[in-house]
Amino acid sequence: MLSPKRTRFRKQHRGRMKGISSRGNRICFGRYALQALEPAWITSRQIEAGRRAMTRYARRGGKIWVRIFPDKPVTVRPTETRMGSGKGSPEYWVSVVKPGRILYEMGGISETVARAAIEIAASKMPIRTQFVIAG
């Protein structure tokens, strides 16, 4: 699972996801990509599940680039705990994804294989996505 090696602060505000993605919304490395159409937090487990699904389907052919990284800690309070006494402890990591953001890229394989592999990865995501071709 992906997570930062070290961070400046252990806990973060939740923030809000306004507008569309201004960075990471163009295909840079591969020829085919999976693009987000909705805003969401995508966990490191979901990112890894999508990556594994694509790798398994594409087998040895092609290369995969993961364009998002989970750099936001999500804190969870223990169950049956009373209110107050501070914020919970960091439980897992998420990547803040806005509409237009490229999640995965693929290259070095045919379009039919890439489309099928990316569709499988898309089913692992908690948001609506679309298949994009460079150019």
UniProtKB/Swiss-Prot annotation:
Main localisation: plastid
InterPro entries in alphabetical order: Ribosomal_uL16, Ribosomal_uL16_bact-type, Ribosomal_uL16_CS, Ribosomal_uL16_dom, Ribosomal_uL16_sf
Subcellular location: Plastid, Chloroplast
One Gene Ontology CC term in the entry: mitochondrial large ribosomal subunit
Sorted UniProt keywords: Chloroplast, Plastid, Ribonucleoprotein, Ribosomal protein
Molecular functions per Gene Ontology: rRNA binding; structural constituent of ribosome
PROSITE patterns assigned: RIBOSOMAL_L16_1 (PS00586), RIBOSOMAL_L16_2 (PS00701)
BP GO terms, sorted: mitochondrial translation
Gene name linked to the record: rpl16
Oligomer and partners: Part of the 50S ribosomal subunit.
Classification via PANTHER family: 50S/60S RIBOSOMAL PROTEIN L16, LARGE RIBOSOMAL SUBUNIT PROTEIN UL16M
Name of the protein: Large ribosomal subunit protein uL16c
Taxonomic lineage from the root: Eukaryota, Viridiplantae, Streptophyta, Embryophyta, Tracheophyta
Top-level taxon of the source organism: Eukaryota
Organism of this sequence: Ceratophyllum demersum
Protein family according to the UniProt entry: Belongs to the universal ribosomal protein uL16 family.
